[in-house]
UniProtKB/Swiss-Prot annotation:
Produces ATP from ADP in the presence of a proton gradient across the membrane. The gamma chain is believed to be important in regulating ATPase activity and the flow of protons through the CF(0) complex. This is ATP synthase gamma chain. It holds the Pfam family ATP-synt. Belongs to the ATPase gamma chain family. One of its GO terms (cellular component) is plasma membrane. One of its GO terms (molecular function) is proton-transporting ATP synthase activity, rotational mechanism. Keywords: ATP synthesis, Cell inner membrane, Cell membrane, CF(1), Hydrogen ion transport, Ion transport, Membrane, Transport. It is found in: Cell inner membrane. One of its GO terms (biological process) is proton motive force-driven plasma membrane ATP synthesis. F-type ATPases have 2 components, CF(1) - the catalytic core - and CF(0) - the membrane proton channel. CF(1) has five subunits: alpha(3), beta(3), gamma(1), delta(1), epsilon(1). CF(0) has three main subunits: a, b and c. The gene is atpG.
Length: 291
């Protein structure tokens, strides 16, 4: 049975941990507000680019642009995995890594067995996981979300598009956490190459005059679209990470509070038992002297 000193030490340790988790929750809440604003602001631009690409694609022969025309066979795949740089954010990293593993081992098992699956890992957690297991990692990024910058998204897009255009991969997918709300993260898997533009129907399409030609605009728009989509996904993941961390630290704080309550009850019971034992010894000693 633990002594009073042991229980006091444990109560002190739990209280110290509770203060840390409470502070981390407050920091995550502040970061979440900023990350959420950036993610929400990026959505309309990315959506409009996608709509423009779809509208223009209806006017031209998309087979002329290799990034819009899919390959007849998929023999090599590139998976872009977006995780966090740190832990203490619940199942955020685990879920993203599980999704990437599912893509590799369940969606493309034959290609993986032939060594045809490559990875780009944005975030230390995913990078470390797959590096230790000796997967084919084209590029790994660590500490990328401490100072998230558009240049990183552009670099990833350039690597992916370069590999696709050179025929080194036939399909590019992204596995990431999309931010929906604090309590409802959304794990997503999206194919970004080849690009599948959403061509509007005849009812929603408008008659525009394009200058220069639609094909020339598409050639300029495709790289911008790819850069923007990857940037949006990284912003979504950043916001989802902070939401997951805030939720995890809130749960940890509540658990610490409950544990302290249990320890205080144990401490009071042990103290009461010690006092009762001392009183019994005093009474027994007094009776012995009387007799």
């Amino acid at each position: 049975m633990p002594t009073l000193k042991d229980i006091r030490v444990r109560i002190k340790g739990v209280k110290s941990t509770q203060q840390v988790t409470k502070a981390m929750k407050m920091v995550a809440a502040a970061k979440l507000r900023r990350a959420q604003e950036r993610a929400v602001m990026a959505r309309p631009y990315a959506k409009k680019l996608k709509e423009m690409l779809g509208s223009l694609s209806a006017k031209v022969d998309t087979s002329r642009n290799p990034m819009l025309s899919g390959r007849s066979e998929v023999n090599k795949v590139l998976v872009i995995l977006v995780t966090a740089d740190r832990g203490l954010c619940g199942a955020f990293n685990t879920n993203a890594i599980k999704l990437a593993s599912k893509i590799i081992h369940e969606d493309y098992p034959a290609i993986h067995s032939k060594g045809g699956v490559s990875l780009i890992c944005a975030g230390s957690r995913g990078f470390d996981f797959f590096r230790k297991r000796e997967y084919n990692i084209v590029k790994g990024y660590s500490a990328v979300f401490q100072h998230l910058d558009f240049s990183t998204a552009k670099e990833i897009a350039d690597i992916a598009s370069g590999m696709y255009l050179r025929g080194e991969v036939d399909r590019v997918l992204v596995a990431y956490n999309e931010f929906k709300s604090v309590l409802a993260p959304n794990l997503r898997e999206e194919v970004i190459l080849p690009i599948a533009p959403e061509i509007p129907g005849t009812e929603s399409s408008s008659d525009y005059i394009y200058e220069p030609s639609p094909s020339a605009i598409i050639d300029e728009l495709v790289p911008k679209h790819l850069n923007t989509q990857i940037w949006r996904m990284m912003l979504e993941s950043s916001a989802a990470e902070q939401a997951a961390r805030m939720s995890a630290m809130d749960s940890a704080t509540e658990n610490a509070k409950e544990l302290m309550r249990t320890l205080n009850i144990s401490y009071n019971r042990a103290r009461q038992a010690a006092i009762t034992t001392e009183l019994s010894e005093i009474v027994s000693g007094a009776d012995a002297l009387t007799n």
